[in-house]
Swiss-Prot record:
Subunit details: Part of the 50S ribosomal subunit. Contacts the 5S and 23S rRNAs.
Organism classification: Archaea, Methanobacteriati, Methanobacteriota, Stenosarchaea group, Methanomicrobia
Entry keyword annotation includes Ligase: no
Gene Ontology, cellular component aspect: cytosolic large ribosomal subunit
One MF annotation (Gene Ontology) recorded for this entry: 5S rRNA binding
Gene behind the chain: rpl18
Name of the featured protein: Large ribosomal subunit protein uL18
Role of this protein: This is one of the proteins that bind and probably mediate the attachment of the 5S RNA into the large ribosomal subunit, where it forms part of the central protuberance.
Source organism superkingdom: Archaea
Keywords annotated in UniProt: Ribonucleoprotein, Ribosomal protein, RNA-binding, rRNA-binding
Family membership: Belongs to the universal ribosomal protein uL18 family.
Gene3D superfamilies: 3.30.420.100
Keyword Lipid metabolism: no
Species of origin: Methanoculleus marisnigri (strain ATCC 35101 / DSM 1498 / JR1)
């Protein structure tokens, strides 16, 4: 006599393709807050998240749309924007009293030089302690936007100097 179904229904977020529970468990077991980097078609989002029983809590967040307030003139979804957003996030986190984190890129592919690693480089350059390997980081020229100025000089304008000026403006906010 059979009892119950013979199939297994996965967790809803796994079924929707939103969560890798094996990777999530390994990140949570460290006990360190997570630096969550997510990229959309229009912006980069970086958050400091801690797990709780009721659900994860976001302690600090930075969005690439905030860069316009610092004088940034480029695209908010580019590699330089990811670098500056990571730097802005680190300044906010350090000012709030959080000095370390571990990187959580979610379901994004870990390709060397990707925008999620540009955000990591920005956070590390601003002083946040995040473990990483040197081989995954983008080149300095890509972080400053030189590759954009090379293939689209009329659209980029003076992007390299703009990125450097915005980086200095963000670092001035560090208390």
């Amino acid at each position: 006599m059979a009892t119950g179904p013979r199939y297994f229904v996965p967790f809803r977020r796994r079924h929707e393709g939103k969560t890798d529970y094996y990777k999530r468990m390994s990140l949570l077991s460290s006990g360190t807050p997570r630096m969550v980097v997510r990229k959309t078609n229009r912006q980069i989002i970086v958050q400091l998240v801690v797990p709780e029983v009721e659900g994860d809590s976001t302690l600090v967040a930075a969005y690439s749309a905030e860069l316009a307030g610092y004088g940034y003139e480029g695209s908010t979804a580019s590699t330089p924007a990811a670098y500056l957003t990571g730097m802005l996030f680190a300044v906010k986190a350090l000012n709030a009293g959080y000095g370390e984190a571990i990187l959580d890129i979610g379901l994004a592919r870990a390709k060397p030089g990707a925008r999620v690693f540009a955000a990591l480089k920005g956070a590390v350059d601003a002083g946040l302690d995040v473990p990483y390997g040197e081989s995954i980081l983008p080149d300095e020229e890509r972080l400053k936007g030189a590759h954009i100025a090379e293939y689209a000089p009329e659209r980029a304008g003076d992007l390299v100097t703009n990125v450097e000026a915005v980086a200095l403006a963000i670092k001035k906010e560090l208390v």
